[in-house]
Structures are given as structure tokens and as C-alpha cells.
């Protein structure tokens, strides 16, 4: 009768330790290491210590490459998400006081005042220059710090630069505009004033010319444009809300 084979306790402990090492490594590294590789690394019964080191180095290298690729993809996505929108035609600051936005064709915006109503201004002139377009006339106004508005005659090509509040009258071919169409405050831009310096009836005119009136009036630092009435205010006559 054959007696059952009895292994020494240290052999049993060693086998159990090898099995647990295999399971632990396979769970730890997941799909990056097969069970066979885990066995070859952990058991120490099939391969040499040098082979086990090479196996781990190989898997660490592959894991490092995957992590680097993931990091690169995440960084590219972050750059796309945070990159500001590009302007195809960004706004430019015109010479002189105040911004002036340009159209896609590079021309200044002159849409805030009528071009075909024969509207002139009797206000004292700073200068008269010959230019080829109303946009060029606006540029001339912006180049002079005191210019508040201009009158351009499309027939004579004369650009009349003004430094006071507009005083309108009718003249064939005239068009009158502010130094920039970007000044477009209406209604609630300025409010809660006590004493008005001047109230002007600007029926048919835009708020840009109300701004021009304030710039061209001594002591005016604020204005309201409500309906068709432009009201100018001095420094000590208001409480800004």
C-alpha cells in the first residue's frame, strides 16, 4: 500500500506564495500582462531572475507609452477647448480719442448717420480737407483730438471738421456724422441728473451725434439720448446710478 506523498511545509508555503503573486500581478496590471507572463515573473521556477526583470521592463515601457499618448491627447483637447475665437477682422483703434470698428473691407463704420438727407452743420470748422470718401473724412476727424463731428459733401469732396456741438441745416450733398459710430449710447447710458446744461432736439439723428454735441460743449461730461431728445449734463449736475 502506497503512502501519500507529504511535502515539507516550506514547499507548500512557497507554492501558495507563487499562486498569490500570480493573481496579484494579473489584477494589478490588468490587460497589460498576461497570466503566463505573471507566472514567469512571480514563480521563479521556469525563468531566471534576469528574465523576470526584462519582462517587467518591457511592460513598464508599454504602459509608459500608453500614458504618454493619453496625456498628449488630453493636452491637445484642452488647447482646443481654451483657445480663444479668432477674429477674421478684429477691431482697430483709430487715431485720436475713441475706438472705431472696421468692416470686412477695411472701411470705417459710417452707418450711424444718414448719407442722403442733405444734412450739414453750421458749427465752427477746425479745418477743411479734400478726401475721396466719407470714411476718409471720419478718419480725418479722428486724427484731431478736438474734432467732435464732421460734414462731408459728396459733390465737392470737401471734409469740414468741427469741434463744437452740431448745428444742423440743409445743404445739397452734405452728410454730417460723429467722429466714430461706436458712440451709440441710448436711454440708460447716462441718467439721474439734476440740472441739464442743454437740451437739443435731435429728431432724425442718431445717438452718435448726441455724443458729438456733448464733446463739443464746454463743461459737458454726460448726456442722455431718449427718443429724439439729446440732453447734456455738466460735472456737478448729476448722480450716476
Swiss-Prot record:
Q: Where is this region: Disordered?
A: 61-92
Q: Name one GO cellular component term.
A: cytoplasmic vesicle
Question: What's a BP term from Gene Ontology annotated to this protein?
Answer: proteolysis
Query: Which residue ranges have biased composition labelled Basic and acidic residues?
Result: 61-83
First and last residue of the signal peptide? 1-34
Its localization reads:
Cytoplasmic vesicle, Secretory vesicle, Microneme
Where is it mainly found? cytoplasm
The PAN domain, residue ranges: 112-181, 185-241
Positions of the propeptide segment: 35-103
Q: What is this protein called?
A: Microneme antigen
